[in-house]
Amino acid sequence: MIWNREVEVVCVAAVLGMAGLFGEAAPFAGVEEEILVGAGSIAECESTGDEATAELLDSTRGAVFTVGDNFDGSSPPEEPDSCYASNWGQHETRTRPVPGDHDYAGGAGSSTGGAEDYFDYFGEMAGEPGKGYYSYELGGWHVVALNSMCDEVGGCDEDSPMLRWLERDLAANDKPCTLALWHHPLFSSGPNSNHISMWAAWDALYLAGADVVVNGHDRVYERFAPQTPEGNPAPNRGIREFVVGTGGASLDTFGESKPNSEARNSGTHGVLKFTLRPDGYEWEFLSAEGSAFSDSGSDDCH
């Protein structure tokens, strides 16, 4: 079931829910439902959007995810994480991040340096330094975090170290539901369009029966119907993708709507909240700054 208000949507990828995520018992650890909440494109010092979305995290329990561009530019060079630390950083002990291009030295699109500041700031929560891909369990869900900065991790094709790791990880998974997170979307109606470099990851997840993919990069909110890696509708087996680059940085505008796009907004900061059940999930976009936009619904796992 899907409830959607307003023609376009701006969304922040928000995911909360974390029993046992960090090596110790989490509050609410006995509940059957887990919360996962978050977004991407977060800390931009000239914007107050990140402060507004951080307030949404303040009132939402569970695990926090990010989908890249955590340090989204404009911080002092000697303190690249300073704007993030003052708002979303208040939740760092329950945050599992992935990196984006702005988290790498040199900024957007850079392949001139590593993400030392990113790995130093998030520590073990970001996975092995230099790799940035890892997985964890959240209730009845298997959560996979990937690094879509392909040039920095030895590629993203089927023969790359990350894809070989992903295939092993999925083969060993015994959870009934799977959600994956990374920065660059394979499907998007935003200005940066589709990133074919992540096709192999989508294909591996699809073949393994994954349920949800969450991305950022485009500073918009968009939700797609379940589909195949080729973009064909697949209501019973396809992966539902969310683009939630609404964490606080200045927002983008949409281009032409892509096939299977079901909800879009480019005017609202916010976070995306998942309620993860053992056999399914609910999603709800939480708008910041008093916006009336909303998008919510539910689905079963495959």
Identify the residue ranges that each predicted region occupies:
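Short, solvent-exposed aromatic-acidic interface loops
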Residues: 283-293
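Bacterial N-terminal signal peptides
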Residues: 10-20
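Cleavable N-terminal signal peptides
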Residues: 16, 26-28
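Extended active-site neighborhood of metal-dependent phosphoesterases/phosphodiesterases
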Residues: 58, 76-178, 193, 197-207, ...
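Bacterial N-terminal signal peptides that target proteins for export
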Residues: 2-11
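N-terminal active-site segment of His-dependent metallophosphoesterases
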Residues: 28-82, 159-160, 168, 188-189
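Active-site glycine-centered loops adjacent to acidic/histidine catalytic or metal-binding residues
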Residues: 41, 68-69, 100-101, 146, ...
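Residue-level marker for buried hydrophobic side chains located in beta-strands
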Residues: 36-38, 64-66, 97-98, 180, ...
